[in-house]
Structures are given as structure tokens and as C-alpha cells.
């Protein structure tokens, strides 16, 4: 393990030198590529350097054990240093796990109302607000790509692009069925209703990855409409694109310009096609090894939001929090971090079993 890290540390030093070369700085695509590689290695190299420093201090304290006057102090420091060594070894093992190539990407977030009618649409709006607030906390940018509003509020469907640092890494475990239990405002008897929404988190596709043949596209234009179906635009600015080979359909009517709507729809379409291809690949890998860590099966119920109890439970990791108001305002870092830690440990176990 440490031989591999030594090689990576040498590569890290090479990258630091390259990033200071004027010709590299002038070549922006190459500079960005090397910068990403440098950033990817920074955490590991820094942890390894701390680890080497702790090992040197442990060795020095062991030498002091032979000195009667220094023995007691050396033993106390040695205990703390050995604890640090163990923690750093665990951190380094996590940092050595194969990185999801999509982790640094922007995402296409799709939220759809499911069972529960109007209440489900209202909850879709609540979820979108929650993720938007979380994005603000992380200084991410949120851009609505398309939205189908419900007459009583919320969304039948909302699709948004979220741009920023490590967006997919933090949001990828949000894909799945989110269930809500609460008393609707229209419920006179005070009975709790259960409804659900589905959330999909797709890594944004880059143009170079998805090459779509124009022949495979059916493009329809129509007038944009608002809640209830009334037309809100006299020109045919809304766009519906169908990818004939896969049957994927994307609609966009958010902008007044047909060109802008077409551009947004194509961005969503490419991301959905890329996600489908990656899911097929993941399924093949899972079948080969009989196991898939963090499959993100979208058909399963992953989380319940119980408003009368002020409770949120994530069923995958058994995490229950009784501060639902704060969570719905985007304070979900604890949930996100717990999920990432859980699936990292699952990956470590799988790696150990395969060794």
C-alpha cells in the first residue's frame, strides 16, 4: 500500500512543478486537467505526510523509553501517537478507494410527484426547496431547466441543473423514493396521509461523451402552458425532444426563447442517456461480482419524512433525526455525510473481501 503512495507523492510533486510552467498555464484545457489531478491527490499526500511524521515521532518516543527520567512522559505521548497512527491509516485506506469518476460533476436533479395527488406535488416542492437551500449552503448554483407546476402549489415535476464543487459526490445517494407522512391542510379529520416523490440525481454529461445523431431525434415545438393548461405564450417556444433509440422524452418550456429551451432540453437529454449507459454498465459489473455497493435502486423507498413526529428516517443506514424543520430548510449535511461514510465503509469491506 505504501509503495503505491510513494509513487503518488512523486507524481504530486511533478504536478506542482508542471502547474507553475508558463506554457502549461497558457494551455487552459491541459491546466484544468492537471489541476484536477493535483486536487485529487492533495488529501492523500497530506494524510501520508502526517502519517510519516507520526511514525518518526513514535520512533523517537520509543528511544526515550530507555531513559528513566523521560519514560513516563514518553509512554503518555506514545499512546496518543499510536492512536493518531491508527486513525491516519484508516483515513489513508479511504482515500485510496477508487474514486467515482462522476464525483466532481454538476448534476441534473429531477423530482417527480408520485402517489398522493396534490399532497405529493406539494412535497415535491418541499424537496426542491430543501435541495436548493442545501445548494446555497454549499455555494452551488441552481438553474431550473423545466418545471410542471401543480394547481394547488408544488410541482408535478421539476428538473434543475446544480453547478458547483463535488455536487454529485454529495447528492448521488439522494436518488430513490422519498415518502412523506403528514396531515394535509384540507384534511378536516386530522388524519395522516402518506404520499411519495421520486428523486433522480444524474451526473451532467459533457458534450464530448455523448454524440447524438440528429436523425435519432424527434423535435416538437408548441406553446408554453402554465398550471391548469392555460397557454401563457403566444409563440411556439416550448420544446419536446424525443430520442428515438431509447424512447427518452424531455420537455422544456421555462424560457421565452425556443433556442434556449432547446439547449436546456438537449443538456437534460444527454445526461439521461449518459446515466442510462452508466447504469447498464454498473448492472453488468454487479452481476459479475454478485454485489453492488450503493446501487441507488430508484424503486426502493429510501427515506421517510414524518411531519407529526418531526422525524426523518433514512432506511438504508437506519439514521433517524428529530429535527425535520431544520432538515427541510436544507440542513442535511449530517445525512449526506453519514451516507457517504456508510458507503465508503461498504466499499472498504468489499475491497478487503476481494483481496
Curated annotation (Swiss-Prot):
Family affiliation: Belongs to the prokaryotic/mitochondrial release factor family.
Location relative to the cell: Cytoplasm
Stated name of the protein: Peptide chain release factor 1
Organism annotation: Geobacter metallireducens (strain ATCC 53774 / DSM 7210 / GS-15)
Assigned keywords, A-Z: Cytoplasm, Methylation, Protein biosynthesis
Post-translational modification as stated in the protein's UniProt record: Methylated by PrmC. Methylation increases the termination efficiency of RF1.
Source superkingdom: Bacteria
Gene: prfA
Pfam families, per the entry: PCRF, RF-1
One annotated GO molecular function: translation release factor activity, codon specific
NCBIfam families: prfA (TIGR00019), PRK00591.1 (NF001859)
Entry-linked SMART domains: PCRF
Amino acid at each position: 500500500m505504501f509503495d503505491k503512495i510513494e509513487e503518488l507523492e512523486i507524481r504530486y510533486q511533478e504536478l506542482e512543478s508542471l502547474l507553475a510552467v508558463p506554457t502549461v498555464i497558457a494551455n487552459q484545457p491541459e491546466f484544468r486537467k492537471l489541476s484536477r489531478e493535483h486536487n485529487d491527490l492533495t488529501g492523500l499526500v497530506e494524510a501520508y505526510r502526517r502519517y510519516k511524521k507520526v511514525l518518526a515521532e513514535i520512533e523517537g518516543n520509543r528511544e526515550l523509553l530507555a531513559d528513566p527520567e523521560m519514560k513516563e512522559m514518553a509512554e503518555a505521548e506514545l499512546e496518543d501517537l499510536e492512536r493518531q497512527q491508527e486513525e491516519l491509516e484508516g483515513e489513508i485506506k479511504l482515500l485510496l478507494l477508487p474514486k467515482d469518476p462522476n464525483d466532481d460533476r454538476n448534476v441534473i436533479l429531477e423530482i417527480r410527484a408520485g402517489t398522493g395527488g396534490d399532497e405529493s406535488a406539494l412535497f415535491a416542492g418541499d424537496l426542491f426547496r430543501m435541495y436548493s437551500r442545501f445548494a446555497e449552503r454549499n455555494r452551488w448554483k441552481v438553474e431550473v431547466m423545466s418545471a410542471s407546476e401543480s394547481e394547488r402549489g408544488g410541482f408535478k415535476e421539476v428538473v434543475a441543473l446544480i453547478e458547483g464543487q463535488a455536487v454529485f459526490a454529495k447528492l448521488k445517494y439522494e436518488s430513490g423514493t422519498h415518502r412523506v407522512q403528514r396531515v394535509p391542510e384540507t384534511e378536516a379529520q386530522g388524519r395522516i396521509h402518506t404520499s411519495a416523490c421520486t428523486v433522480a440525481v444524474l451526473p451532467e454529461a459533457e458534450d464530448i461523451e455523448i454524440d447524438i445523431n440528429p436523425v435519432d431525434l424527434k423535435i416538437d415545438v408548441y406553446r408554453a402552458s402554465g398550471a391548469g393548461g392555460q397557454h401563457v405564450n403566444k409563440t411556439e417556444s416550448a420544446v419536446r425532444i424525443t430520442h428515438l433509440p431509447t424512447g427518452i422524452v424531455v420537455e422544456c418550456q421555462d424560457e421565452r426563447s425556443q433556442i434556449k429551451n432547446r439547449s436546456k432540453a438537449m443538456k437534460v437529454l444527454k445526461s439521461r442517456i449518459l446515466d442510462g449507459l452508466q447504469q447498464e454498465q454498473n448492472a453488468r459489473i454487479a452481476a459479475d461480482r454478485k454485489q453492488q455497493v450503493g446501487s441507488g435502486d430508484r424503486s426502493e423507498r429510501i427515506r421517510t419524512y414524518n411531519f407529526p413526529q418531526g422525524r426523518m428516517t433514512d432506511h438504508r443506514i437506519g439514521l433517524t433525526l428529530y429535527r425535520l424543520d431544520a432538515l427541510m430548510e436544507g440542513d442535511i449535511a449530517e445525512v449526506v455525510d453519514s451516507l457517504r461514510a456508510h458507503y465508503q465503509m461498504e466499499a472498504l469491506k468489499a475491497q478487503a473481501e476481494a483481496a
